[in-house]
A protein has these predicted regions:
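Charge-rich, low-complexity N-terminal segments
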Residues: 1-110
Length: 110
């Protein structure tokens, strides 16, 4: 099995829809670090699991300089964003979404 990971920094904004009062319910932004983990039993015709630039382009296109609430139909928590990103990237099995130094969410396919 081959494994690769790609780390991408994105500047994004969102607001959370919560059942309790929180600063996160208001529009705010993050300089998030997204780490995408991909795997494959075989390499493609170029000798890769996936091209790192493809992963970067996908993640940047989804999130960078975006108001994420306009792009998704779910509550854009770090956990949900990690799952959403994982679903978009070829051969992805795990995503870590770090919205700040201390707040990190991970989604991993079973």
């Amino acid at each position: 099995m081959y494994y690769v990971e790609k780390r991408i920094e994105v500047a994004m904004a969102h607001r959370l829809c919560l059942t309790y009062e929180s600063k996160s319910s208001h529009l705010h932004g993050h300089n998030a670090i997204v780490t995408v983990y991909c795997k494959s039993e075989t390499l493609n015709e170029n000798g890769m699991v996936v091209d790192f630039s493809t992963v970067k382009d996908i993640v940047k296109g989804l999130l960078d300089h975006q108001y994420v609430n306009d792009k998704v139909d779910f509550n854009p928590t770090a956990e949900n964003l990690a799952r959403w990103i994982c679903e978009q990237v070829p051969n992805c099995y795990k995503v870590t979404f770090q919205e700040s130094r201390d707040n990190i969410a991970t989604y991993e396919k079973e």
